[in-house]
Amino acid sequence: VKMLAIAEPDMTFSSDREPLEAGLGHEKHITECINRCYAAANDVHDFRAMQMLDWFVKEQGEEEANASDMIKNMELFGSDPKGLYALDREYQARAFVAPTMPM
């Protein structure tokens, strides 16, 4: 296996909010992709695929909500050091829970 270099992102941001908005835009793009897959499965009556995709629909809804919440928090705290410190602590305390997909 040959590991290749990961290219530097070609995006530049002029504010702290812009990367969060880009992240939310990407999450919305992923939602659209999942929805197209779901619609295709529905069109051919592939109910097992639809059942599997239900999990992705739910998870993606949570991802969009998280991205949106980050933007709201940035608007709320802005450049307030104490607020940003508290927000940073809150994000650090979040525990990863491995997703489970019913089979």
Segments and roles (model prediction):
Residues 1-103:
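Iron-associated oxidoreductase/ferritin-like identity signal
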